[in-house]
């Protein structure tokens, strides 16, 4: 998984629009 440079501790990943998802409080792209 590649880190997307976004955390998802308090708010969801905005980067989900480019295929990222929340894992361990950080957004990753599979």
Curated annotation (Swiss-Prot):
Disulfide bonds join 4-20, 8-22, 13-27. The keyword Thylakoid does not apply. Keywords: Disulfide bond, Knottin, Plant defense. Contains 3 disulfide bonds. This is a cyclic peptide. Signal peptide: none annotated. There is a cross-link at residues 1-30 (Cyclopeptide (Ser-Asn)). Expressed in pod but not in flower, stem, shoot, leaf, seed, root and nodule (at protein level). It holds the Pfam family Cyclotide. GO terms for biological process: defense response. InterPro entries: Cyclotide (IPR005535), Cyclotide_bracelet_CS (IPR012323), Cyclotide_sf (IPR036146). It comes from the Eukaryota. The keyword Protease does not apply. The presence of a 'disulfide through disulfide knot' structurally defines this protein as a knottin. Probably participates in a plant defense mechanism. Belongs to the cyclotide family. Bracelet subfamily. This is Cliotide T6. The lineage of its organism: Eukaryota, Viridiplantae, Streptophyta, Embryophyta, Tracheophyta.
């Amino acid at each position: 998984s590649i880190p997307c440079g976004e955390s998802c501790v308090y708010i969801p990943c905005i980067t989900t629009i480019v295929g990222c998802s929340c894992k361990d409080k950080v957004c990753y792209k599979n």
